Amino acid sequence: MVELWQGLGCVFTPEKLLKFITTLTSNSNFCIAYSGGIDSHVLVHAMSHLCQEHPWQLRALHINHGLNPKANDWENHCQQICNRLKIPFQSERVTLSLQPGDSIEAVARKARYAIFQQALSENETLLTAHTENDQAETFLLQLLRGAGVKGLSAMPAKRKLGKGELVRPLLAITRDDLKKYAEKNNLRWVEDDTNLELRFNRNYLRHEVLPILRRRWPEVFAVISRSANHCAEAALLLDQLAESDLQLIQKDSELEILPLLQLTPERQRNVLRRWIYLHGFQLPQTKQLEQIRNDVLLAAHDANPVFSYHTIEIRRHHGKLYLSNALSAHNATPLISWNFSRSLPLPGDLGTLIAEKKKGVGIKTTLDTSKITVRFRQGGEQCQPAGRKETHTLKKLMQEWKIPVWQRDRVPLIYLGDKLIAVVGYCICEGFEAKGEEWGWNVEVQPPK
């Protein structure tokens, strides 16, 4: 990002913004995240000039958090500026739900980006006005949290967002440069007085720490930005190494423990982070990651340990690591009537049963469906899978099928009266399976959305 601006001088102009944007994206539909502050106002103003010379579509999106008594005034200001510049304007209001210990900044940011993600259309680029100053602040915040190279990468210049993408074209421009542009063009922007409140960590860095660093090291913003770029490159290499390791140790969505144990502890931690990240879960802290290694990965081979953090559970079973949302409470006692004709929502987070008529597979359609019920394992059930000569306990069969212990009571069982006739996803019992030209109900579990 910094290299792109070398040789261009420090004065911000729409022409230099054009060079950024065309380097970062080939899209021609843009949506500006417009707060009304000086940074986003400069971006709106410069983009309006570029749109007069290029066949681009441009709109502005304002988020009204309602946290400040002046919030409605800021929204009106943004509306007026966009009307003057003939830019389509949209405002969205959010109500923040704060829990004890929540950071207002973090909750507001999450709500804001949820709206951005939903609002973007296909091939549309969201432009935000984050500057080199913002990048330095983010880097220092992550540093003081003990972040690794991924966190120290701070904000990427470009990433996917919803159906479109997010681009930050001002990451190598300082606020001072934007202020010069704003004053030269007689722009009027809003001032958020909460940006002066030192109780917020970012504000403390902005007003107390960085000015001291800048007096000693005038190029501190550019230097920190360069370090963030180095960290981003290192993080990419670590991700590539993890992907290479996952090719060898991941089967379906589980990790094979033996090949994982052959890696160095550093690569084990790297793989675990990537595995958890790719499943869309919150990454563990360093201490939690070490607990996962010690308590789950390195547990006795016949143990079935579980490690829980946030809303996540990591378990070990039959030489594999499993990752899932924390299991909800499950009542295994209900009998649910079902005639196969409609989908059947299962209790809790177990998903939905669906049945499709097919020839030669599934449960015979000639059965009396008025006697069909769906149940769950209580213990002591017996089953003779179709094609096998002997009856076995369901417990033994589930061990044979290598169903993890914590999932066994959650597998739907289909009964005809008091007779077990199918274990959904695993077998039809002898005498109840459709063969040849016979029609059958092919039953599957549809995971919860």
UniProtKB/Swiss-Prot annotation:
Catalytic activity: cytidine(34) in tRNA(Ile2) + L-lysine + ATP = lysidine(34) in tRNA(Ile2) + AMP + diphosphate + H(+)
UniProt organism field: Coxiella burnetii (strain RSA 493 / Nine Mile phase I)
UniProt name for this protein: tRNA(Ile)-lysidine synthase
Known function: Ligates lysine onto the cytidine present at position 34 of the AUA codon-specific tRNA(Ile) that contains the anticodon CAU, in an ATP-dependent manner. Cytidine is converted to lysidine, thus changing the amino acid specificity of the tRNA from methionine to isoleucine.
InterPro entries for this protein: Lysidine-tRNA-synth_C, Rossmann-like_a/b/a_fold, TilS/TtcA_N, tRNA_Ile_lys_synt, tRNA_Ile_lys_synt_N, tRNA_Ile_lys_synt_subst-bd
Gene it is expressed from: tilS
Entries under SMART domains matching the protein: TilS_C
Sorted UniProt keywords: ATP-binding, Cytoplasm, Ligase, Nucleotide-binding, tRNA processing
Binding site for ATP: S35, G36, G37, I38, D39, S40
PANTHER family named among the record's database cross-references: TRNA(ILE)-LYSIDINE SYNTHASE-RELATED (PTHR43033:SF1)
This protein's domain notes: The N-terminal region contains the highly conserved SGGXDS motif, predicted to be a P-loop motif involved in ATP binding.
